[in-house]
Amino acid sequence: MGLMIRSSSIHAAGCYTTSRIAKGVQVVEYTGPRITKQEADARFRNSPTTYLFGIGDGSTVIDGHGTAMYINHSCDPNCETEELDGRVWVMSLRAIAPGEELTYDYNLYDGDEDDARCHCGARNCRQTMYSSEEIARQKKALKQKARRAVEAKRRKAAAVTQAKKGGKAASRSNARKKATRR
């Protein structure tokens, strides 16, 4: 099976097949050094583009090198990834024609800092590379943040109102004290 890297309409460069690939085939292995998530976070803190692939529970990542690192995200992919015996394989979801770009759904998670816009152009595009679960988690977090902000404003307004009432009460009480002293 032949694969080649060339320009992609999805993102910069992409991985294309030069021959037909049947459904359910191991297309290519995702390879590269294995590093901890903490090491990856430190190493790539200021890098807008990475080729990291979380494996297992996510505490280890593959710093992608080789052909598979050029496989782009699509919301309507022709491949998927599968962990087999500690290795990550890109598997075909359907028959893929020669010249077709290989794609899989990145299903990103843990995305508090980046919107990870998707440019796949699929009819069912989510507009992001995050998984549906991550999108739901982010929406819930935003709602909670908005609720906390509203509650903080309410508490502040109540404190201001209370201070004004307390100030008026103190002024009246001081006026009464002055009046009784005379």
Please annotate each region the language model reported.
Residues C75-R182:
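C-terminal SET catalytic tail plus cysteine-rich post-SET Zn-binding segment of SAM-dependent SET-domain
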Residues M1-E82:
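Catalytic cores of histone-lysine modification enzymes
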